[in-house]
Amino acid sequence: VEWFGYSASVSPYILEQFEKWAGYKFRPEYIVDQGYHNSMFRVPSRQFLDFIEFQQIEVCALAKELVDIVHSYGKEAMMFLGDHWIGTEPYGKYFAGIGLDAVVGSVGSGVTLRMISDIKGVDYTEGRLLPYFFPDVFCEGGDPIGEARDNWRKARRALLRSPLDRIGYGGYLKLASNWPGFIDEIQNVVTEFRQIHENMQGTPSY
């Protein structure tokens, strides 16, 4: 997900630092982009690519400082991959230098599962399966069991190609525990995941 993108990371301080790094001023047109505002479906300009690289260098350096603090307390550092994570893209060339122990992300489909499970340079990956335990699903007219089954079917096939190390759910546990049959459904999901995980260890999918 990229709700705002690099265009939302501009500030007077950043522009000053970019000019020192790149050797030229960052112009408004590099963001306006002829009115397209650097949509993900646009080929970025050379100047915008420079800005992306600059931000990746800066953000990864800052992220490493935070990870080092976490490690100094003997804890693992895990990043949630989602919403707005510019600069720390796991497939970027500076990601490995952050030193994260793990990455967790929301699994909406087989595509997003692979985006998480294929990440290199971390000790393990985790998928947050759907639905979230929120009132918009666990309500009159909602179908959390159906959503859980549908999400698992989409994720399961991708899991066979590139397994996650862990799965989980998020939200208000009381909503899940009070919904008839939901915990039983999740138990089935967890059992299947464990079987796949055990059978896939060290075994190529093709």
Where are these regions (language model features)?
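Polysaccharide-binding and catalytic clefts of secreted carbohydrate-active enzymes
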Residues: 1-100, 106-109, 115
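General secondary-structure edge motif
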Residues: 50, 138-139
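Carbohydrate-binding surfaces of carbohydrate-active enzymes
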Residues: 71-73, 109-122, 126-133, 139-206
